UniProtKB/Swiss-Prot annotation:
<keyword id="KW-1278">Translocase</keyword>
<dbReference type="GO" id="GO:0005886">
    <property type="term" value="C:plasma membrane"/>
</dbReference>
<feature type="transmembrane region" description="Helical">
    <location>
        <begin position="152"/>
        <end position="172"/>
    </location>
</feature>
<keyword id="KW-0812">Transmembrane</keyword>
<comment type="similarity">
    <text>Belongs to the complex I subunit 2 family.</text>
</comment>
<dbReference type="GO" id="GO:0048038">
    <property type="term" value="F:quinone binding"/>
</dbReference>
<feature type="transmembrane region" description="Helical">
    <location>
        <begin position="393"/>
        <end position="415"/>
    </location>
</feature>
<feature type="transmembrane region" description="Helical">
    <location>
        <begin position="5"/>
        <end position="25"/>
    </location>
</feature>
<feature type="transmembrane region" description="Helical">
    <location>
        <begin position="358"/>
        <end position="378"/>
    </location>
</feature>
<feature type="transmembrane region" description="Helical">
    <location>
        <begin position="96"/>
        <end position="116"/>
    </location>
</feature>
<keyword id="KW-1133">Transmembrane helix</keyword>
<keyword id="KW-0813">Transport</keyword>
<keyword id="KW-0830">Ubiquinone</keyword>
<feature type="transmembrane region" description="Helical">
    <location>
        <begin position="63"/>
        <end position="83"/>
    </location>
</feature>
<comment type="function">
    <text>NDH-1 shuttles electrons from NADH, via FMN and iron-sulfur (Fe-S) centers, to quinones in the respiratory chain. The immediate electron acceptor for the enzyme in this species is believed to be ubiquinone. Couples the redox reaction to proton translocation (for every two electrons transferred, four hydrogen ions are translocated across the cytoplasmic membrane), and thus conserves the redox energy in a proton gradient.</text>
</comment>
<dbReference type="GO" id="GO:0050136">
    <property type="term" value="F:NADH:ubiquinone reductase (non-electrogenic) activity"/>
</dbReference>
<feature type="transmembrane region" description="Helical">
    <location>
        <begin position="31"/>
        <end position="51"/>
    </location>
</feature>
């Protein structure tokens, strides 16, 4: 291994070393140390010497890979900071929790930087294995173990599909390199059946990890059973990493026979997720089904023109992640010995008890719904515009209808926030870590909606 390759891997090595080191720290320091480690890894990704480093045969070291690593590291740091309240009230195994969070970030970074089918498998499975445990790690939560099992069992099937698909693609093309495998698969006319089957299985595995319908059935139960910070991390980072590799080094939309299947997954996700979210009274289950809809929107970025779709997709990932982490973080900030607020009724009268929580939650939910001038509106505007320019008129019309209907299920909990409720229990004050995260989430949601230009220039420069 050359010095340049070592520099390219430095952020990943920091994450790996940090995940081991925090196991030897005290419970009180583990979460904060893990958050600092994630931020340091993000900093090393932009270290001048690292910027000049070449990639390795398995992972890239371009601006796209470094930008994605920065986002995953910041999401991991936010998860650790938002989980600090659980350490005292929920008897959280903080050291193991912190180590697994860093390991999940490491898997996401490897996945989004993958240039080989081997690193794609390693990154995806590293991330998934960490989440298996993180979902069930809260010993005070009786539904956590059940949620972990519901994520584990279908995950085994998805991993088997992915491994079998990779084997078929290698048999058809003779290479593990992603770009070469896609090019060789498309070289024949028609595409060899074994290659098409292999890519279809890989796409099915990715659809499970991103909870695209009909591979989403695990999502509502897992979100409900997992702690709020982990549910937010799963909804943003885990799914975001899958779409990052689909937008970057593994653009499955270039394989023409897969485009109708991707379009079908997008349409089914928007329809199924919207209809299911309408019936929910549990906030975390509603957010789970709405995330299925948002993943359907992101498929439009994968299908769209390469450069426009990537810019729109990355911007949407950023704005969706900020709103999602902030929303789940607000639920986590209200946790007590009795657990997290679950049903809409638990939010009743929150505006009178904690006005800032109510205002923040309202703004983040409105951004997810796509209300201007918040970032969610701008994200949908550019995403739907890119898909429309690429000729996907039917999918864009369906996305617009789905977005319009989503206003109902996003506004329902908002109405509960501002109802008057006598004798409602008090909620704890924000701690310093929570204040920092909520200011950042609210800032991104507002600034990216009002001044999106700098973000698009940054994402345009990141295109591989």
């Amino acid at each position: 291994m050359t010095w340049n390759m070592l520099l390219a891997l430095l952020p990943l090595l920091v994450l790996f070393g940090g995940s081991i080191t925090v196991l030897f720290l005290s419970e009180r320091r583990a979460l904060l140390s893990a958050a600092m480690c994630a931020v340091v890894a993000a900093g090393f990704a932009w270290w001048p010497a690292s910027l000049e480093a070449a990639g390795t045969p398995l992972v890239a070291s371009n601006l796209f890979a470094r930008g994605c690593l920065t986002l995953w590291a910041l999401l991991g740091a936010a998860t650790c900071l938002l989980s600090d309240r659980y350490r005292g009230s929920r008897k959280l195994a903080a050291r193991e929790y912190a180590a697994l969070t860093l390991f999940a970030v490491l898997g996401m970074a490897i996945l989004s930087a993958s240039t080989s089918l081997v690193s794609l498998f390693l990154g995806l499975e590293s991330m998934t294995l960490a989440f298996y445990v993180l979902i069930a790690v809260d010993r005070e939560n009786p539904t956590g173990a059940e949620a972990g099992l519901k994520y584990l069992l279908p995950g085994f099937l998805a991993s088997a599909l992915l491994a079998f698909g990779i084997a078929l693609v290698y048999a058809a093309t003779g290479t593990f390199e992603l770009s070469a495998a896609i090019s060789l698969s498309m070289a024949g006319a028609p595409m060899p059946s074994i290659a098409l089957l292999g890519w279809t299985l890989i796409m099915a595995a990715a659809a499970f990890k991103a909870s695209l319908a009909p591979f989403h059935l695990w999502t509502p139960d897992v979100y409900q059973g997992a702690s709020a910070p982990i549910a937010g991390f799963l909804a943003s980072g885990s799914k975001g990493a899958v779409f990052a590799v689909l937008l970057g080094s593994a653009p499955l939309a270039l394989i023409v026979p897969l485009r109708p299947l991707l379009g079908g997954l997008a349409a089914l996700s928007m329809i199924w997720g919207t209809l299911a979210a309408l019936r929910q009274t549990n906030l975390k289950r509603m957010l789970a089904y709405s995330s299925v809809v948002h993943m359907g929107y992101l498929v439009l970025a994968v299908l769209s023109n390469r450069s426009a779709g990537m810019e729109a997709g990355l911007f949407y990932l950023l704005t969706y992640s900020a709103a999602t982490v902030g929303t789940f973080g607000l639920l986590a900030s209200m946790v007590d010995s009795g657990g997290e607020p679950q049903d809409y009724a638990a939010l009743e009268g929150l505006a009178g008890r904690s006005p800032w929580r109510a205002v923040l939650l309202t703004g983040l939910l409105l951004s997810l719904a796509g209300f201007p001038p918040l970032a969610g509106f701008m994200g949908k505007f550019v995403l739907f515009g890119a898909a429309l320019q690429s000729g996907y008129v039917g999918l864009v019309v369906l996305a617009l209808l789905s977005s319009l209907i989503s206003c109902y299920y996003y506004l329902r909990p908002v109405l509960y926030l501002f109802r008057v409720r006598q004798g409602a229990p008090t909620v704890p004050a924000f701690n310093n870590c929570e204040r920092l995260i909520f200011v950042l989430c609210a800032g991104v949601t507002l600034v990216a909606g009002l001044y999106p230009g700098p973000f698009f220039r940054w994402f345009g420069a990141m295109l591989p």
